[in-house]
Amino acid sequence: MASKRLPGPGGWTGRLVNVLIGLLLMGIAASVSVAATEPAAEDAAIAQSLAEMLRDARAIISNNQAKINDPEIGDKGLTAKVVLDQAMGTYKKNTGVDPATIDPNSRHGRLLRAMMAAIAEVMDANQSTINAKGIGFKAFIPAVFGRLVGESFARLANGEAELKVTAPPELVRNRKARPDAFEEKIIKTKLVEASWPRGQPYSEMTDAKGRAAYRVMVPEYYAASCLTCHGGPKGEMDITGYPKEGASENDLGGVISITLYRAPQAQ
């Protein structure tokens, strides 16, 4: 199976693929013939787009933890529309592309809209939890949000794609987030290695569940704010009731794993 690091920012190859990705994200790729566009470059762009939207929405949940867990406040104002509007704004700021302008009839547009619908679905389903008055910690944390969005996305994508937020096995707290054999292999042999360029995704054309698939794994690293639950002292219980991992800032803390299934004619 062909495998590779997704191109980094340096070198002419990286610049060329970044141009292709930029064209796709801006919708200009529609003017490029399908035959002239590498399927892998298109899949890489779609995967990065999905990961970006998830991260942007999850950051809102992270930044509002104090409000969510405030027992004195009822309505937190974190409706599906508020969260999605903010996430779309951040996406546009980070990519230079308004997600609403991406052709909904394209594969990219379908999957990005499935991701946005999944975000809205999760927020709608958890309003009673978020807005519960008289309750402090509500367990609606970024990790839970990411898992729920991934589950909703897989259903809404209707067999075209899947997304899961996973991590090195020793860091996984929820069995639903455990890496599969492929993910565990790439984490252990690639992403945790000191030689792996920080933040660089890994991609591979392989088989998944008996189907041809392009798989992308986007590494994520602990920020200072993550260490409240995942830092030290190791073994001490955090607010969620799990023992802290003793991690340090910039350690590999998770991976956004995206599977894009190939139609038979695209193989």
Where are these regions (language model features)?
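N-terminal signal peptide c-region/cleavage motif recognized by signal peptidases
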Residues: A29-S33
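Intrinsic disorder/low-complexity signature
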Residues: R15-N18, A40
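Extracytoplasmic c-type cytochrome modules immediately beyond a signal peptide or single-pass transmembrane anchor
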Residues: V34-Y221, G235-Q267
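N-terminal secretory signal peptides that target proteins for export/translocation
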Residues: M1-G14
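The canonical Cys-X-X-Cys-His
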Residues: Y222-K234
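Bacterial N-terminal signal peptides
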Residues: V19-I28
